[in-house]
Amino acid sequence: MGKKLVVIGAQWGDEGKGKIVDLLTERAGAVVRFQGGHNAGHTLVVHGKKTVLHLIPSGIMHDHVMSYIGNGVVLCLRALFEEIKALTAEGIPVKERLRISPACALILPSHIALDQARETARGKDKIGTTGRGIGPCYEDKIARRGLRLEDLRHPDDFRQKMQALMTYHNFLLENYYHQTAVDIDATIEEWLAYGKDVLPLMEDVTLALQRHQEQNVIFEGAQGAMLDIDQGTYPFVTSSNTAAGSASCGSGVGPHQLDYILAITKAYTTRVGSGPFPSEQINDIGEHLAKVGVEVGASTGRRRRCGWLDLPALRRALLNSSFDGVCLTKLDVLDELDEIKICTAYCHHEQIIDVAPLGSESLAECEPVYETFTGWKTSTFGIKNEAELPQKARDYIAKIEEYLGIPVVIISTGADRSHTIMRQSLLE
């Protein structure tokens, strides 16, 4: 039997999941996306060449791997085919390697218009959404008025359903947000044209994954645990469940089939958009982390906020997702610092707590409690052998393991796939 491994971002997203999934996929037969949409931005660097994927699983770069988009993903067909076109131009036979669940909810241009109109209307209270229609699409899915990929199998019915849904969207856009309506007829024709190309890619992902019982399968999470709609810093969250449990319901694979849950976390913390961030450094340290770590969002181009590693937030993610091990990324970004801090607890209303509280208001009231470490002041960039790490860097990693109570099994020391220390083989 193959191993079924779930890869979850343990912070506020942007932890480096794409590189790690790409690396692990060398020993896998399939990779599955199970939540989110094209608001994800997974950056891969292979042999010095950079590829950014937003919707298609990171396993698409491997010729021996099937890539699946599960039912928990919300699908923008325009974004999908832009990505397919770009990858095909690079010589990657995407249509041979990719299959998509018919149960995926469809993102329409009117979802995107609503998303952007709502964010504009919020003004200074904006959430920080990517403006790509993710939230409004999930909203329609839950309200059972949304369209699914399988609806394209019946063009006449699809036309009627889309007409009704977009009429509702346009009413909101014009009468509540005072924005321009989206052209319904043009959108219907565009989406029906996409339908002809997407039909061959449709497959029941639940059944398809049963064919991979003897192979390793990677379940690729998007965003991060602290952006979970239920367990994250609500309302400054994404619109899907990002914890490990969503790998099951978002792909149709039973939870007993999942063997190992890997947390991805940077050696420090970043966040894009609005919301509380107790260990944020709005100073020279934050500037240094942003510059050296090249902290710019792959999906939006927005600069990320930066701060020290936040263990109470990681503990919240650990409780939600039952991580078996940790992959620590961007260790090399800390190389030049004289001292390095870890937020080990919060002070909340004069009480010391070691797990991040639920919701944004309580988290905003927390003050970080730090433990300070002497920096190693030696380059770790590109190191592949743990023995070559400076002792102070190893002490830093050991302290993270001690606080979390689980092992750091992978250490990333650079963007390239080869810049990795594998302390434990996760896939045989």
UniProtKB/Swiss-Prot annotation:
Recorded superkingdom: Bacteria
Residues annotated for substrate binding in this entry: 298-304
Family: Belongs to the adenylosuccinate synthetase family.
Cofactor requirement: Mg(2+)
Binding site for Mg(2+): 14, 41
Organism of origin: Dichelobacter nodosus (strain VCS1703A)
Active site feature: 14 (proton acceptor), 42 (proton donor)
Gene3D superfamilies the UniProt entry points to: Adenylosuccinate Synthetase, subunit A, domain 1, Adenylosuccinate Synthetase, subunit A, domain 2, Adenylosuccinate Synthetase, subunit A, domain 3
Listed GO MF terms: adenylosuccinate synthase activity; GTP binding; magnesium ion binding
Name assigned to this protein: Adenylosuccinate synthetase
Predominant location category: cytoplasm
Keywords: Cytoplasm, GTP-binding, Ligase, Magnesium, Metal-binding, Nucleotide-binding, Purine biosynthesis
GO CC annotations on file: cytoplasm
Entry note: cofactor: Binds 1 Mg(2+) ion per subunit.
